[in-house]
A protein has these predicted regions:
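Catalytic alpha-helical scaffold of carbohydrate-active enzymes acting on polysaccharides/glycoconjugates
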Residues: 1-152, 157-197, 222-245, 251-314
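Positively charged, amphipathic and often flexible ligand-engagement surfaces
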Residues: 185, 199-220, 240
Length: 314
């Protein structure tokens, strides 16, 4: 096991090269609906159980089925209202199990990035060849369904190996959502040397983390979103920032949670200088306009730190 995967070094937030967004926007805002498929009786993984209770896992399966039956339609209608194109973190198996959901999102020109095949099948314990095949299968399945190859990746159930990002970059991916380390896009060093970026994806604003893990009530969640926006919007006056709201159609789309979520979306989209966009568009813009300056700044800072260390040791 590596001590450090080496994807990114320390790069302080202050005094970085300025990031500019289209139209002079301060903040790039995207919503990432996780549209997933969970199996009732999934294959067992030796490192992680898919369900906290014995199989068949009817309660867990059925609430997620509620999300795909009811919650998705509710959330899609709300995003339509505010002119937000979702960036779907998609379990590729959904293309087979619920192709009608994929078709509805495709009609709206939503982005599809890959979230693995099933959200009950994990990377843990896979060989490199097996993981490569799983990622490739998910990319191919989504491309067949929507006509465009996924540019982004979020590991299924956030399960990773040491080479996950290397493999996705080698297979043609442009960005990862698996590094929760910044509020701006950053370069990611991968073994093949591809131009590859991290696009901010917030665990703090993730509805599952908020509601299930941190036990936050809906009104407080809505206020958290507004507070996060205010901070990032203010910082964006100096250099462009990114705000992502990751959602799940069986969480935020429950009836008692929708009003607070809508109020937050209304607040954000009511501000000027907000680029309402997708993960792919953020990655493509950054790779074209900010990536090289970021690499140069990182190299310069590393050289300065090295020379300072050498001077102290002399």
């Amino acid at each position: 096991m590596k001590d450090d995967p080496g994807y990114c070094g320390h790069w302080p937030y202050r005094n970085r090269p300025k990031i500019t967004w289209p139209g002079g926007a301060r903040l790039a805002f995207w919503v990432a609906p996780n549209i997933e498929f969970y199996e009732l009786d999934p294959p067992k993984n030796p490192q992680r159980a898919a369900w906290p209770h014995p199989y068949p896992a009817v309660p867990g399966y059925s609430i997620r089925d509620y999300g795909n039956r009811v919650g998705h339609m509710r959330q899609m209608k709300l995003l339509d209202k505010y002119g937000i194109r979702g960036s779907i973190s998609l379990s590729a198996a959904l293309c087979t199990h619920h192709p009608e959901i994929v078709a509805l999102c495709k009609e709206r020109d939503w982005e599809f990035f890959t979230h693995g095949i099933y959200n009950t099948r994990y990377t843990y314990g896979m060989s490199e060849a097996q993981e490569r095949e799983a990622i490739l299968d998910s990319m191919d399945t989504i491309e067949r369904a929507v006509g465009r190859r996924p540019a982004g990746y979020l590991a299924p159930a956030l399960s990773h190996s040491e080479v996950t990002l290397d493999l996705f970059a080698e297979l043609g991916g442009l960005y990862t959502c698996d590094l929760f380390h910044d509020d701006q896009p950053t370069p990611v060093t991968v073994r093949g040397g591809q131009r590859f970026a991290s696009v901010p994806y917030s665990l703090e604003l993730n509805d599952t983390i908020a509601f299930v893990v941190n036990k936050i009530e809906p009104r407080r969640y809505g206020q958290m979103i507004k507070d996060a926006f205010d901070q990032l919007y203010a910082e964006g006056s100096e250099s462009g920032t990114v705000m992502c709201i990751p959602t799940h159609n069986y969480q935020v789309s429950c009836p008692h949670r929708m009003r607070a979520f809508e109020e937050a979306l209304d607040y954000i989209t009511g501000h000027p200088d907000v680029w309402v966009t997708t993960g792919r568009e953020i990655a493509e813009h950054y790779l074209a306009t900010g990536y090289d300056a970021s690499l140069a700044d990182i190299a310069a800072r590393n050289a300065l730190a090295l020379s300072s260390t050498d001077a102290k040791g002399a």
